[in-house]
Every structure is written in C-alpha cells, then in structure tokens.
Amino acid sequence: MAAQKIRIRLKAYDHEVIDSSARKIVETVTRTGAQVAGPVPLPTEKNVYCVIRSPHKYKDSREHFEMRTHKRLIDILDPTPKTVDSLMRLDLPAGVDIEIKL
C-alpha cells in the first residue's frame, strides 16, 4: 500500500496571515507525530485593474489597482487519525482559503 499524503494549499491576500496560519498547521502536525514538508511558497498571483479616473472623458488619466494572492503548500506525510482530528479542530483566520486534498 502506498504511503498516505495530505496536501494543504493556503491562499490569502495578506502574507503575514498566511504565514502565521502555515506555522499553526505545521506545529499541530508535528505535535501529533506526523511528518510535514513545507510550507512551500508558491508564486504570488498579481491581478492589476486599470480604471479611468474621470467619470466622463480624459481617457489619458488612469489609475491602477492591484490584488496580490499569496499561496503556500504544505504536505503531511503518513498522517495519523489524531493528526486529521486536530487539523479539523484547528481555528484559522477568516482571510485564509484552505484546500485539502487526500
């Protein structure tokens, strides 16, 4: 039988929030006795929106806004039932999107 692996992918707009969440996950996993690989920083996605400043004309005057999406990847190798239970109970901030693949 192949070794089990849980892959957790985190996304957030604030890099400090995502780093603290990744730190919490790694501490929880190591405390329960499973091995962890990561957090691996994935490329930051940058969306730039260009908006005309004036409501009428003056197309030459524009303003740029950007949204940066930071991503992290954590692999949990050989998870125990205690590991899965503690991950389900873990309380993370609302600004972090979590994707879990088994």
Swiss-Prot record:
InterPro entries: Ribosomal_uS10 (IPR001848), Ribosomal_uS10_CS (IPR018268), Ribosomal_uS10_dom (IPR027486), Ribosomal_uS10_dom_sf (IPR036838)
GO biological process: translation
SUPFAM superfamilies recorded: Ribosomal protein S10
Pfam families linked to this entry: Ribosomal_S10
GO cellular component terms given for this protein: ribonucleoprotein complex; ribosome
Record keywords, A-Z: Ribonucleoprotein, Ribosomal protein
One of the record's GO molecular function terms: structural constituent of ribosome
Highest rank taxon of the organism: Bacteria
PROSITE patterns: RIBOSOMAL_S10
Complex and partners: Part of the 30S ribosomal subunit.
Functional note: Involved in the binding of tRNA to the ribosomes.
Protein family (similarity comment): Belongs to the universal ribosomal protein uS10 family.
Protein name: Small ribosomal subunit protein uS10
